[in-house]
């Protein structure tokens, strides 16, 4: 499992555990409020990717959950099942069609990808240039650009609506834009520990990276 794959499948995680941002009013303040007030959440997502030539890949949809610090589940239900789940120490990607599970340590898997914002182990400003964007589609936006030229992506735009994340748009190093729309967000539910526990199904290949 590459960091690039994780950054796509866990795009919701970009919003979950970011360090508080002492920035200007607008999307930055809303993200700060979300981080301060929301310790866990569940919701639904739709995800689509458009290539540099305008070619659109099949849309995905599913559900997500997260809990600070560092736990999340990103479950693709359609058109094909796929699961990325973190227990805070390990990240697992399960692909039923391939009958394969890939396992990495959280730090190794996330590295300097956008999902590093999820874990909030350091100062966001040290890893990203963060700036406000003009309002668009009735949402307030911010942009984070990696300071590391080898991050594998160019920028990630995050849209906020009423102190809740509404959309993520990731531009990768290949010129592809992945858009994730979030809905039905429930803030601060009580989530059982088993929500972020993963055991590989019998008979599948387990690859440890």
Swiss-Prot record:
It comes from Bordetella avium (strain 197N). SUPFAM superfamilies: Prokaryotic lipoproteins and lipoprotein localization factors. NCBIfam families: lolA, PRK00031.1-3. Belongs to the LolA family. Residues 1-24 form the signal peptide. InterPro entries: LolA/LolB/LppX, OM_lipoprot_carrier_LolA-like, OM_lipoprot_carrier_LolA_Pbac. Participates in the translocation of lipoproteins from the inner membrane to the outer membrane. Only forms a complex with a lipoprotein if the residue after the N-terminal Cys is not an aspartate (The Asp acts as a targeting signal to indicate that the lipoprotein should stay in the inner membrane). Monomer. One of its GO terms (biological process) is lipoprotein transport. It is found in: Periplasm. This is Outer-membrane lipoprotein carrier protein. Keywords: Chaperone, Periplasm, Protein transport, Signal, Transport. Gene3D superfamilies: Lipoprotein localisation LolA/LolB/LppX. GO terms for cellular component: outer membrane-bounded periplasmic space. The gene is lolA.
